[in-house]
Amino acid sequence: MGEASSFVAVRLMRIIPILAILGATYYIFLTCFASFQATDVPVPEEWRNHDAVVDEVDEITETLTHDPDSRPTPHKLTIAEIEDLENKGEFMGFEDEDEIDVFINLDDDGDWEEDDLKKELGDELEGDFEDEEDEDFGDDDDDDDNDDDVDWSRFAYIQYVTNEDYLCNSVMIFEQLHRLGSKADRLLMYPKEMLEPDAAYSNKRGGQLLIRARDEYNVTLQPIEIQHRDGQDETWADSFTKLLAFNQTQYDRVLSLDSDSMVLQHMDELFQLPPCPVAMPRAYWLYNENPPKRILSSQVMLIQPDDVEFERIVQKMNSIGPNDYDMEIVNSLYLDSALILPHRKYDMLTAEFRNKDHTAYLGSEREKWDSSVALSEAKFVHFSDWPVPKPWINDVETRLANQPDCPEGETSCPDRDIWNGFYTDFTDNKKRVCESVGKTGQKWIHWRRM
């Protein structure tokens, strides 16, 4: 008996510490829980009015379920019931004259398919999708912002002058580029005996025009030796000077423009075309000849100056025939490799407004000629209206005798008005830019082209 009591006492002594620890832990837990304060989370308003919402839903459901005018949905109709409704001219709540919207497919994302929407809603949504696409590609303002990153000193419009008679035309081209806001440099190659490039004064009209071009139109003056080759036509004997543009390696690219022309819009965007030795438009007016002459026009040339290319030019100049000039040289070298510029923008002839057939210019027998559209898209227009002389030659009688025809009984029409406008604008520009040189105290008003 005594041994049993002793055994129980020993067991109790071992259990008591464990019970004490458990009790203390439980006490601490109760104390911490009692002092904890829960965050006051507001109850959503719709939960507070749960009963009202449930009642409203029940009321709507009951109305829909027990509406005596409601019709059963298709899956609840029997075939006989469907046929009966069709015979009565009504189905699914629509009368025969009602306009029923077609079903529109959903794409994988659960959105309405664009083609189905356009087919169903037509022009109403056409503009919306176009607006979204335009937003993806940015707007014109973004292009203007990108221009700010371009080093325009790497590019130049280039003109060449062989004598004083053509100097005025070139200065007029540069004045037009200046007025139109072109950002590229302007380079004028001229006979070195006309003026020192840094001269401050000249008592000759040619020198005064060069100074005006330099000081007012930001033109860089480049004295040169005239490149002359004897041939059957002395008019073009000095035109090889134009090819010196291939040697202006101080620039990455130069845009050569014939001076017997008018610039209607600047062409700075051409300097950003993919790299190529030369880019030129087709001489589209020769495509109507029989047989057609498929050659390139040297009236506009985007050139990548290069020593090797210029060496090829010089070699070709030294081996030409008596009837070969600058146009023949560039075609012999680049006809099959030049990048083609669109002539409708960059090399339009004034004679196009006198033509009856515009297929060669439009490049299509189906497109209709619209002189106003042609004028609005053209950036460079070349004076070429045989037998009408060049615009700096005053021969009004010949010009009026060969002006574009108008419908019978009419003295004015778009073709005639635009064509005559080129010549009158040239005359006005010449007076303002060239004939005013050396005169002081006069204010020359900038004209506006029609």
UniProtKB/Swiss-Prot annotation:
List the biased-composition ranges (Acidic residues). Answer: 123-148
From the record, give the transmembrane residue ranges: 15-35
List all topological domains (Cytoplasmic). Answer: 1-14
Provide Lumenal-side residue ranges: 36-450
Where it sits in the cell: the answer is: Golgi apparatus membrane; Vacuole membrane
Motif extent (DXD): 258-260
Domain of life, per UniProt, equals Eukaryota
Record region (Disordered): 122-148
UniProt keyword annotation of Membrane present? yes
For this chain, the family text in UniProt reads: Belongs to the GNT1 family.
Instruction: Indicate what this protein is called per its UniProt record.
Output: Glucose N-acetyltransferase 1
